Curated annotation (Swiss-Prot):
Keyword Transferase tagged: no
This protein's UniProt keywords: Cell membrane, Glycoprotein, Membrane, Transmembrane, Transmembrane helix
Pfam families assigned: CASP_dom
Cytoplasmic side: 1-43, 114-128, 205-208
GO annotations of cellular component type: plasma membrane
Name of the protein described by the UniProt record: CASP-like protein 3A1
Source organism (scientific name): Hordeum vulgare subsp. vulgare (Domesticated barley)
Family: Belongs to the Casparian strip membrane proteins (CASP) family.
Cell compartments where the protein resides: Cell membrane
Region Disordered: start-end pairs: 1-33
Keyword Transmembrane among UniProt keywords: yes
Length: 208
């Protein structure tokens, strides 16, 4: 140390010192924060999306199988009836939106499985979490809207039209009405599970 006091520089001793005013050697290397894994939250996300997929598939399969023939007696006249989901615009919309929601849920489950194989976080970034939140809300509202429209048609078939001679169509067509009601119930349950997925997305956003 006395060599520095005698005016000798550090290069003569084989020592290199940082330049004056530079903090490069004093600052620790910066690393980007990794996304949290949250295994319990990831399991809840998988369960909610799997349930939404099952409900959407059930809604489609039940509605597609809803068709029946029967006869209706009005003023003693036998009128042949044929009921099928494709004859109603509202029921067609329910089938289409439920199929789209099933495809969306399946795609998300496959994405989660892919990230699990790579041992990466289920939700790697805030941007991805925002995309999930937007998709979940869109399909939840779409299924709610389609289910409500289909429920109005099913209720009209079951109660008939008041102040007219049109009676309850579900009496001669019980199978069609029961399958339609079950399909609509599954659609509402699928909407609920998609809404639960949206809540889980919000929790992910709060932790990223």
């Amino acid at each position: 140390m006395g060599s520095f006091a005698n005016g000798q520089n550090g290069s003569e001793l084989g020592i290199q010192t940082p330049a004056t005013g530079s903090n490069a050697a004093l600052e620790p290397p910066t690393t980007s924060a990794a996304a949290p894994r949250c295994p319990r939250l990831g399991m809840a996300m998988v369960a909610a999306r799997a349930a939404a997929l099952v409900m959407a598939l059930l809604s489609v399969s039940l509605m597609v199988s809803a068709k029946q023939r029967g006869t209706l007696a009005i003023f003693g006249i036998e009128i042949p009836l044929y009921a099928k989901w494709s004859l109603s615009d509202s029921l067609q919309s329910l089938v289409g939106i439920s199929a789209a929601a099933a495809a969306y849920s399946l795609a998300q489950l496959l994405s989660i499985a892919h990230t699990a194989l790579k041992k990466a976080p289920v939700v790697p970034s805030r941007r991805y979490a925002w995309m999930l939140l937007a998709g979940d809300q869109v399909f939840a509202y779409a299924m709610l809207s389609a289910g409500s429209a289909a429920a109005a048609v099913a209720n009209l078939n079951r109660t008939g039209v008041r102040h007219t001679a049109l009676p309850n169509f579900c009496k001669p067509l019980p199978r069609f009405c029961d399958l339609s009601a079950a399909s609509i119930a599954c659609a509402f349950l699928g909407c609920a599970f998609l809404a639960a997925s949206a809540v889980i997305d919000v929790i992910w956003l709060s932790r990223l």
